[in-house]
């Protein structure tokens, strides 16, 4: 099913770039504007890119770790990690290749956010042969992709109950469904009954608070914990880490002093910087702007 979704995305990208006005969208999407980057703040751009990497790859919450534990020992973890990163980047690139040029073709503002997929794509499908069929299939596959993402995110919680508590999968899933429903209520009520609760000032809501806690707190702190655990002798240690990463057949992670130094000292520092900048940006915006602009 995901292969079919990928195939439809390729067809959509081909169709979109042939629309009138799509060329300007391609320029907007593919040609970097370094002047605007400097005006916005290079530090802010880098921070936003790193934050997106945390989010899109589910770093810091153990999802990749759990799925990595499910693959056979003969597989190369290095190769699988590069494959996941490459495929994720390719899909994101294709999505941009579809949405941004379509915005220019249909005179839409490209900065409107995720909802653009439901605005631009129906227009694209309307101009394609068998567009209704392709559109129905695309949004159906998108729904299943979203569901599979939800399953992936909560697999580590389900696995926790199964591995450490000996709970059956069916019971662990049922417990998590109940917990998700209860914990999701404040977010849902934040747009009506709890709309008066504005944690970050006027215009903010419960969803903004939860997004900040996950994106700016749990993901970077979780990633920092994993990095320190894998590289510190108080945790797993680099020797055990390299042994596990380079087990199996295929691509190996180079075991040299430069990479070891990077993993042990530079990488934790970068993750810590992402965490600190997220809080400074939220709670000390004037100081943040003076530094990064």
Feature roles, as predicted:
Residues 199-228, 252-293:
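A generic transmembrane alpha-helix motif of multi-pass inner-membrane proteins
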Residues 6-32, 101, 105, 186-192, ...:
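Hydrophobic alpha-helical segments and their helix-loop junctions in multi-pass secondary transporters
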Residues 153-167, 202, 206, 228-256:
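Alpha-helical transmembrane segments
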Residues 2-147, 151, 165, 171-175, ...:
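Membrane-embedded translocation segments of transport machinery
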Residues 147-152, 173-187, 191, 208-243, ...:
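Hydrophobic alpha-helical segments of multi-pass membrane transport proteins
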Residues 58-73, 144-159, 223-241, 275, ...:
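Transmembrane alpha-helical segments in integral membrane proteins
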Residues 79-87, 249-261:
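Membrane-interface segments at loop-to-transmembrane junctions
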Residues 99, 110-118, 195-200, 204, ...:
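Flexible glycine/proline-rich, aromatic-decorated loop/lid segments
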């Amino acid at each position: 099913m995901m292969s079919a979704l990928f195939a439809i995305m390729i067809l959509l990208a081909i169709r979109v770039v042939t629309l009138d006005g799509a060329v300007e969208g391609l320029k907007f999407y593919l040609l970097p504007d370094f002047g605007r980057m400097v005006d916005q703040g290079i530090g802010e751009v880098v921070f936003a890119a790193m934050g997106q990497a945390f989010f899109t790859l589910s770093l810091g919450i153990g999802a990749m770790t759990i799925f990595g534990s499910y693959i056979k020992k003969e597989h190369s973890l290095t190769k699988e990690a590069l494959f996941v990163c490459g495929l994720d980047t390719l899909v994101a690139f294709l999505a941009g290749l579809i949405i941004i040029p379509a915005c220019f073709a249909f005179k839409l503002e490209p900065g409107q956010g995720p909802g653009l997929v439901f605005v631009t794509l129906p227009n694209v499908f309307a101009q394609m042969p068998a567009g209704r069929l392709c559109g129905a299939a695309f949004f159906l596959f998108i729904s299943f992709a979203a569901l599979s993402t939800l399953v992936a995110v909560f697999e580590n919680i389900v696995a926790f109950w199964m591995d450490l508590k000996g709970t059956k999968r069916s019971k662990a899933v049922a417990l998590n469904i109940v917990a998700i429903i209860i914990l999701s209520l404040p977010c849902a009520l934040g747009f009506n009954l709890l709309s008066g609760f504005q944690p970050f000032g006027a215009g903010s809501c419960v969803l903004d608070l939860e997004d900040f806690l996950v994106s700016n707190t749990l993901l970077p702190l979780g990633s920092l914990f994993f990095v320190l655990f894998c590289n510190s002798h108080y945790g797993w240690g680099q020797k055990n880490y390299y042994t596990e990463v380079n087990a199996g057949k295929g691509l190996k992670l180079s075991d040299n002093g430069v990479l070891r130094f990077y993993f042990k000292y530079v990488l934790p520092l970068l993750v810590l910087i992402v965490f600190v900048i997220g809080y400074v940006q939220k709670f000390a915006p004037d100081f943040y702007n003076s530094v990064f602009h």
